[in-house]
Structures are given as C-alpha cells and as structure tokens.
C-alpha cells in the first residue's frame, strides 16, 4: 500500500490555523538559535526559514528584513521580561532590600540561565556594526532596565532604608556583574575552561555585598527570599 502525504486541501482547517498561529514563534526560536550559534551577520535569512520549516518567502511575510527579525527576537525574549519586571517592582509591598534581591534572582531565572541570555552576548559582540540595532537595544532594553533598577534604589533611599548614593552609578554597579555572568556562560564556560563557579551563588554574594553597601544602619536586615506573585513567564524564557 502506498502512503501519500496529505495535501494542504486535505489538512483540517483548524490544524492549518494552529500551525499558522504558531509560525511566528517558530521563526523567532529558529532565529534566536542561529543568531547565537553563528552570529547575526553570518546567519542568512534562508537558514532561519529552513530551520523553522518554511520558505524564505514565508519568513518575509512575517519579518521583512533580518534586522526586523532580530528586533522581534529581542522583544519576545528580553523586552517582555523587563515589562513584567516593572509590574513586579510597582506592585511589591516588601522592603526595598527584599525587592532588589528578588529582582536580581529573577533576572537570572528569566534571562541569565535561559537561551535568551545569548542575545546579550550577541549585542556585545556585534552591535557596533549595526547602529540601528544598537539604538533599538538602548531604547527598548538598556534604558528601561536601568530605570527599573534605579526605581528600586531610589525607593530605598526615599524610605530611609538605603544611603543617599549616586543612583545612576549604583545601577551600573548592580548590572555589570550580571553581564559578566552571561559573557562567561557564552565564552569560557562554554569551552569548559577557566574558573568554575555557580552563577546563582555569585548572585547571592552580589546581593549580600550590595545590600551591606546600600543599607543604612537602621535599614540593615537580611534580604529574605521574597514571595511576591510574579507574572507568568513568557514563552521567550524556554530553557
């Protein structure tokens, strides 16, 4: 007996619709994997389409250029996480120490230890050659993320829990170790060379050092793991 593949006309309409709805995410997943594996400049659009199981023409129906595809990869995997982070910050009812510790831990869970972390490595290694992407990254990722951390620090200062530090530079001091963890993950650690350490343990050490530097004598207290209800993780954080 000869088995023939179903033609599009014989595939149930509901199934075709589900496939169509899933296609943008499939393209974004394929693009993320290839951009991180090969680099943005070295990845061809037809490679993304092939990995997603569609034609190059279908890819362009959703994303008219490779640059627009990368922007959507960033939105899906990183920008959405920052938006959810801001919701958490503004709804949080605990101390600023607890909030800061919670956000640092959550960042590693949602971005640092997921495949989305490869985007940060990609930006650092290639963005100088793509000024439009650089502007997009600053506007959609760097600036909002910095504002979120600054809001937490300022919250602590206003309540008297934190010392009146330079907020802008405090933000840089908080973010830099997180970027180091990502770069190490995608460089030396990927080659199984260099010092071995547990990123979550490093983040706990960072929390301890930072809070002891920020807190006033009256505000000093251990930052217990917070029990805030965070928004559901977006699909971009797939491990």
Question: Each predicted region: which residue ranges?
Answer:
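Amphipathic alpha-helical linker/stalk segments
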Residues: 71-103, 109-111, 115, 119, ...
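Short secondary-structure transition hinges
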Residues: 83, 109-151, 193-196
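Short amphipathic alpha-helical segment with a characteristic S/N-K-E followed by hydrophobic residues
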Residues: 27, 42, 65-70, 80, ...
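Membrane-interface starts of transmembrane alpha-helices
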Residues: 163, 167-171
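A conserved beta-strand->loop->alpha-helix hinge within the catalytic CA
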Residues: 47, 94-99, 166, 198
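Amphipathic, non-transmembrane alpha-helical scaffold segments
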Residues: 20, 28, 74, 134-146, ...
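C-terminal peripheral helix-coil segments that are non-catalytic and often amphipathic
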Residues: 1-14, 98, 102-106, 143, ...
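Basic, helix-initiating cap at the start of DNA-binding domains
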Residues: 1-38, 42-54, 61-68
């Amino acid at each position: 007996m000869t088995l023939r593949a179903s033609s599009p006309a014989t595939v149930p309409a509901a199934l075709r619709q589900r496939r169509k709805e899933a296609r943008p995410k499939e393209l974004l997943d394929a693009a993320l994997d290839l951009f991180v594996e090969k680099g943005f400049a070295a990845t061809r659009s037809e490679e993304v389409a092939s990995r997603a199981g569609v034609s190059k023409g279908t890819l362009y129906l959703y994303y008219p250029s490779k640059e627009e595809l990368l922007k959507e990869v960033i939105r899906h995997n990183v920008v959405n996480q920052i938006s959810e982070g801001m919701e958490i910050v503004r709804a949080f009812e605990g101390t600023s120490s607890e909030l800061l510790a919670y956000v640092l831990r959550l960042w590693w869970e949602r971005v640092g230890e997921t495949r989305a972390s490869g985007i940060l490595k990609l930006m650092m290694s290639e963005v100088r050659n793509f000024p439009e992407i650089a502007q997009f990254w600053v506007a959609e990722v760097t600036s909002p993320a910095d504002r979120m951390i600054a809001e937490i620090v300022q919250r602590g200062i206003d309540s008297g829990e934190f010392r009146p530090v330079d907020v802008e530079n405090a933000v840089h001091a908080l973010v830099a170790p997180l970027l180091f963890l990502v770069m190490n993950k995608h460089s030396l650690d990927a080659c199984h060379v260099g010092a071995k350490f547990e990123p979550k343990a490093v983040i706990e050490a960072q929390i301890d050092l930072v809070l002891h530097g920020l807190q006033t004598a009256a505000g000093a207290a251990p930052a217990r793991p917070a029990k805030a209800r965070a928004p559901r993780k977006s699909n971009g954080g797939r491990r």
